[in-house]
Amino acid sequence: MREESRSRKRKHIPVDIEEVEVRSKYFKKNERTVELVKENKINKDLQNYGGVNIDWIKALKPIEYFEWIESRTCDDPRTWGRPITKEEMINDSGAKVPESFLPIYNRVRLMRSKVKTPVDAMGCSMIPVLVSNKCGIPSEKVDPKNFRLQFLIGTMLSAQTRDERMAQAALNITEYCLNTLKIAEGITLDGLLKIDEPVLANLIRCVSFYTRKANFIKRTAQLLVDNFDSDIPYDIEGILSLPGVGPKMGYLTLQKGWGLIAGICVDVHVHRLCKMWNWVDPIKCKTAEHTRKELQVWLPHSLWYEINTVLVGFGQLICMARGKRCDLCLANDVCNARNEKLIESSKFHQLEDKEDIEKVYSHWLDTVTNGITTERHKKK
């Protein structure tokens, strides 16, 4: 998967809106007033953000465990309809928040509260439960340790792969474990160790780099047994020691596996949008890791988890890398990267009655929910 504004009048829907220094050729000293986040300090101060008791989590029963994870990493779109206030944007570093953040982000959250996107239906966080349910394994029967493993495998499969294909690959492995290996729990460490690597590669052929990923998964399974008490690591160093696992996957796995919000998960959508809106330095932030470190300087910890889900879904359906729908975007009156010609020709711009505009937008929301993302797709 690849990847100035001028004043004008138009109709729109109103919206109420440590000491390890990061060294890189892209990050030179004294070029910005805000220093990049210090990784050691974040880990040292985790208790201030509600650090977790790993032994306590391991002892939780399935229902208790999933309630705990849900309380830490809520993906309920209904919570995104409420605008974030300036008071909520206070951060520990005292760093200045980009002026465009709240006007744009509040509108993006509102849009995300209305539509269901691929990441909501088939993203990594949904895969273990969705696949288990599809295979007849009820949520309350999913062992937390297996859930954590299945989530990790899902993230490894997801690299440079669409959510739908990743979900299919996870389903293929699960069905093989159930039907061929006769493992009632689906994907387990024992099952992954028993599957021959060529067989595993064939099961996940629908994802990109499936041969390499099969090798990574086999090696990871053995490492978890040898070095991590047959469970996933609970710190970023341990997670990153696994083959094929990078920071994006690592922080997301810590979030959904242990409820530990130790860093922001920055994928291609988050990286692209944050640079486009100048929330991070678009010149210095050449990689997702650069973007993550800059974001963590000023973004309040309370938003570290949700920003990934919010922006990924927005980037999948409304502000794609190619074919942006500025004509349908509620943030097109505050966005610095809007397409003026597209907006001028839109139905929103032509309509004079706000009620009609809301009606058109509601109809568009219905089509998106039903899986149709653009008028171009409908014509095809």
UniProtKB/Swiss-Prot annotation:
Its main location: nucleus. One of its GO terms (biological process) is base-excision repair, AP site formation. Residues 15-40 are annotated as: Interaction with MLH1. There is a cross-link at K194 (Glycyl lysine isopeptide (Lys-Gly) (interchain with G-Cter in SUMO)). A motif (Nuclear localization signal) lies at residues 8-12, 376-380. Changing F27A: Abolishes interaction with MLH1. One of its GO terms (molecular function) is 4 iron, 4 sulfur cluster binding. The record marks D267 as: Important for catalytic activity. Monosumoylated. Keywords: 4Fe-4S, DNA damage, DNA repair, Glycosidase, Hydrolase, Iron, Iron-sulfur, Isopeptide bond, Lyase, Metal-binding, Nucleus, Ubl conjugation. InterPro entries: DNA_glycosylase, Endonuclease-III-like_CS2, Endonuclease3_FeS-loop_motif, HhH-GPD_domain, HhH_base_excis_C, NTH1. It comes from the Eukaryota. Interacts with MLH1. This is Endonuclease III homolog 2.
